[in-house]
C-alpha cells in the first residue's frame, strides 16, 4: 500500500509539474517589436514561409504582399499569389493600433471583419519581417527578396521561436522566378 501511495504522489507531482510548465510556456504573451517605420516597411514583401491558412489554400507559389499608405490615413494591402488557374489577389486596408509604435495593425479584407497583424521580428535593415497574431495561429516570414539568405532566415525563425510559435506547422513558399 505504501508503494502505491508513494508512486501516486510522485505521479501527481510529475503531472502537476508538466501542467505548470506547459501553462507557463503558453501563457507568455506575444510581443510586437518596439517601433516600425511605416515608410520603410511599405512596398513589396515576398512570403518565405507561413502557417497553412484556409484563405491561402489555393496559393501554390509566388505569394507576395504590398503595403502602401493611402489618402485616408490607412495602409492599402494587396496580397497576391499564383494558383493553379492563374493569379489570386486580395485587396484590403490596414489601420495602426495606437500605442505600439506602428508594430500592431488591424487588417480588413472584408468590412467589418479584421484580423491582427503584429510585427514580431524585424531586421534592422528591413530585409525580413516576422508577422503573426497574438494567439499564435498565424505566422508569416516575409522578405524583401524572393529568397532569404540562410543567416537571415535563421534569425527570422529564431524570432518566431522566441515568441513561442511552434514551427512544426511552418510551410515554405515557392518563389519561382522566370
Residues of each region from the PLM?
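A beta-rich soluble binding module of mature secreted/lumenal proteins
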Residues: 2-178
Amino acid at each position: 500500500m505504501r508503494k502505491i501511495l508513494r508512486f501516486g504522489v510522485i505521479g501527481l507531482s510529475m503531472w502537476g509539474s508538466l501542467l505548470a510548465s506547459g501553462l507557463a510556456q503558453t501563457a507568455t504573451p506575444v510581443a510586437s517589436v518596439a517601433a516600425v517605420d511605416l515608410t520603410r516597411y511599405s512596398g513589396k514583401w515576398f512570403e518565405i514561409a507561413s502557417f497553412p491558412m484556409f484563405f491561402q489554400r489555393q496559393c501554390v507559389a509566388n505569394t507576395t504582399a504590398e503595403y502602401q499608405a493611402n489618402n485616408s490615413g490607412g495602409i492599402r494591402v494587396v496580397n497576391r499569389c499564383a494558383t493553379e488557374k492563374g493569379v489570386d489577389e486580395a485587396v484590403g486596408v490596414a489601420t495602426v493600433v495606437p500605442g505600439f509604435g506602428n508594430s500592431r495593425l488591424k487588417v480588413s479584407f472584408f468590412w467589418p471583419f479584421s484580423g491582427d497583424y503584429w510585427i514580431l521580428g524585424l531586421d534592422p535593415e528591413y530585409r525580413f519581417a516576422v508577422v503573426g497574431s497574438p494567439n499564435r495561429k498565424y505566422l508569416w516570414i516575409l522578405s524583401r527578396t524572393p529568397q532569404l539568405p540562410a543567416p537571415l532566415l535563421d534569425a527570422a525563425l529564431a524570432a518566431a521561436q522566441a515568441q513561442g510559435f511552434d514551427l512544426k506547422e511552418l510551410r515554405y513558399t515557392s518563389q519561382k522566378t522566370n
